[in-house]
Amino acid sequence: MLKNILLCSLQISLLGMSLGGNVLIWPMEGSHWLNVKIIIDELLRKEHNVTVLVASGALFITPSSISPSLTFEIYPVPFGKEKIESVIKDFVLTWLENRPSPSTIWTFYKEMAKVIEEFHLVSRGICDGVLKNEKLMSKLQKEKFEVLLSDPVFPCGDIVALKLGIPFIYSLRFSPASTVEKHCGKVPFPPSYVPAILSELTDQMSFTDRVRNFISYRMQDYMFETLWKQWDSYYTKALGRPTTLCETMGKAEIWLMRTYWDFEFPRPYLPNFEFVGGLHCKPAKPLPKEMEEFVQTSGEHGIVVFSLGSMVKNLTDEKANLIASALAQIPQKVLWRYKGKIPDTLGSNTRLFDWIPQNDLLGHPKTRAFITHGGTNGIYEAIYHGIPMVGVPMFADQPDNIAHMKAKGAAVEVNMNTMTSSDLLNALRTVINEPSYKENAMRLSRIHHDQPVKPLDRAVFWIEFVMRHKGAKHLRVAAHDLSWFQYHSLDVIGFLLACVASAILLVAKCCLFIFQKVGKTGKKKKRD
């Protein structure tokens, strides 16, 4: 009897394995990897087989053997971890030193172009590491993958998918001014009311704001055309036919966008764009004993959680002391993720940690506020738990993210470059003491939780959907098949203008003919 039960269990187990899909991952570094890793874990839980392509010089992606269904294919590239770390560091410093503003915009783009060129060199090394590795490509071909999940920030995932003859899905937070979503994904972005990403604008724009928004879109379009155009020849050579980066990216079956309407302003989107913002969020777990004891000493005042993310390791002594001085003046206890020199002005209410369980702290009932750099992952954890924020944005989408939270009444912003100790102190007192900030944060939290399907389940559903149906062509808009002048109906407008011009010309000719006839008749009568 026991033997039969064991055999039955084994058969069910094998059946589950056979029904599992075969997923290939083309990942991106940093926080992008953290989001994809959450999806991978859920795919593994649902008994899919997952293979992750990892460059030998990867910085954040650490191969692990958490499951026999998870495989890391490590391929050689002509650089080490130091190179990727250097590019990331240059990117952050360039943004910190030249944060886009009307007075610094051209300097910013000039300096950022250099960093992007360096990024392209690294990306090309990664592409070559896979596409020119015949042994690896042959092995991948034999694995019979059913779908590839890619982060479009790193090019070539789409090429790998097309080479293997499988559909691919994108996981994306944003591209500058949504150039990729707009030009490659064909999503409409009316500049009259849809703020360009990185513009720090909202959907409530004055005339001046709309001018600024329009210019922001055009400038980012220009940047995309000039800095990413070089990939067109690479894609053409790799695929063996004339094509472009954008045309190839447009073949993505589904775009998993890492935001949701608790964060975004209302705007048009397409049916193959799915929102999965906050897929990494989860209920808080108990804190480590020592940390919980410190939190409990806060009494009725509660705690403040402070983190500038993983990209900023430390601050200048002056800035650290300025911050510590402000934190020392609030009655709350503060848990600060910080690895630098201990500030001289550090108060007895503040404790420093190399690392903090951020999600668990934000979900703690004693948490009153979150001081954040404005990364999307951190903001979503605050939304999930209904915690008001003090934003200290520094680079990339962070200023834009905080602008969204300010517009929704859940955050106050301070400028890292110009803030004083009193600025930070006043911002903290505002979000802690004014009830509207907590109320708005809770409203966003309720919106986030009130979804028919959880973000992570939605992401996995669409990956499985594409595997089941070999794609999602029924969701692909016909705009992909049109040229740019057809898309904007310029041929139709030209035809109609020609018709109107022809009609006007015909009427004018008729009038002239009639006038001439009448004139001749009048002259003839006078002569008679």
UniProtKB/Swiss-Prot annotation:
Membrane topology: Single-pass type I membrane protein
Gene3D superfamilies: Glycogen Phosphorylase B
Presence of the UniProt keyword Transmembrane helix in the record: yes
Recorded family membership: Belongs to the UDP-glycosyltransferase family.
Signal peptide stretch: 1-21
EC number(s) recorded for this UniProt protein: 2.4.1.17
Pfam families, per database record: UDPGT
Protein name: UDP-glucuronosyltransferase 2A1
Gene coding for it: Ugt2a1
SUPFAM superfamilies: UDP-Glycosyltransferase/glycogen phosphorylase
